[in-house]
Amino acid sequence: MRLFIGVELDEPVRTAAATVMRSLAARLDAAAPDFQARWIPAARLHITVWFLGEVADGPASLLMEQLRAPLPVPAFELELRGCGAFPRGGPPRVLWIGAGAGAEGMTEAFGELARRLATLGYAPEARPYSPHLTIARVKDPGRAVRAIRQILAAEPATCGRMTVSALTLFRSRLSPHGAAYEPLHRVPLA
C-alpha cells in the first residue's frame, strides 16, 4: 500500500487555503494563459511530513507499531501564509503555501519521526525538510515563469493558525480521478 505521514488541516485553515487557491488560479490564468496546473482539491489538502511510498502489509504493521507511542514533541500552533514554488530556481513544478510561525514545531516533529523511522530502515530525503502545503502540481509553466513567480510572491495567502497535536499515517489510493487519502493511524504529540 502507498503510505505517507502528514498533518490534517482544520476546517478554517482548509477553507482559507481554498480561497487562496481560487485567487491564485484566476490571477495565473489571466497573466499566463499557457500555464497548466493540477490544483489539489480542498478536501485532500494536508501537509506532508514524510512520504513512505509503497509499503507491503508486513512492514506496514511494523510501521504502525513503531508509531504507536506519542512523539516527544509538544503540540504547537502553526500558521500557514505566503506562497512560493519548488524548485526555487527554474520552472516551477509545485506551488505551495508556506509554514510561518510554528514551522520549527514541524521541523522538530520531523526530526523525532526521522529517529523513529530510522529503526525501520527509512532515511529522510537528501534535501532539508521544508514544511509547506502543496496546492498545485504544475504540468506546464508556459512561457511566463517570471510572471508566475511574481504573482506567487505578491499573494498575501494568510490562511490562519491551527493547533498541531498529532501526525497522521495516511494510505493513498491512486485512481484516474486523483488520489484518495484514508487516515490509518494518528500519532499524538506529547
Regions found by a protein language model. Name each.
Residues 1-190:
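Histidine-dependent nucleotide/RNA phosphoesterase domain, centered on the 2H-phosphoesterase fold
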